[in-house]
């Protein structure tokens, strides 16, 4: 397999606030979430999701924080069944980067904290065929600080 180079941009200031992150394809979306939050120094104490569309809340597929699945109310379980979503499809901890079948130029959205809505989007810049698929996430370049 391979590793992937993503440019992660803050939606509110994409030219001045971004990070380049390399991550192995066998790594989970939860691993990517941790790399993003570490690189922007925003913590880990809120719910989050990755989406496949540019419109965050209207994404056809949402890969959510594992905490989204803890102690779900019954109506949420019912909604997931009706919508055709199963935990395996939507729990980000169980989805690898490889499983997304991304091509160079494809985009993902990432939303952290459902109340404050820290919005980021990711662009796949390069597929690194010679890098191992188990590669730990690495921040290779960046610009700007959120709290600076």
Describe each PLM feature range.
Residues 1-148:
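Short linear regulatory motifs enriched in tryptophan with gly/pro/ser
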């Amino acid at each position: 397999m391979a590793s992937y180079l993503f440019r992660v941009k803050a939606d509110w200031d994409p030219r001045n606030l971004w990070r380049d992150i390399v991550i192995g394809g066998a790594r989970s979306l939860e691993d990517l979430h941790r790399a993003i939050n570490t690189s922007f120094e925003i913590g880990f104490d809120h719910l989050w999701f990755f989406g496949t569309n540019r419109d965050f809340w209207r994404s056809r597929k949402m890969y959510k924080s594992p905490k989204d699945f803890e102690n779900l109310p019954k109506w949420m379980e019912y909604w997931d069944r009706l919508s055709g979503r199963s935990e395996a499809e939507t729990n980000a901890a169980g989805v690898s980067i490889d499983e997304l079948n991304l091509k160079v130029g494809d985009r993902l959205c990432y939303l952290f904290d459902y109340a404050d809505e820290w919005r980021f989007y990711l662009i796949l810049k390069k597929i690194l065929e010679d890098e191992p698929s188990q590669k730990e996430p690495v921040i290779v370049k960046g610009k700007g600080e959120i709290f600076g």
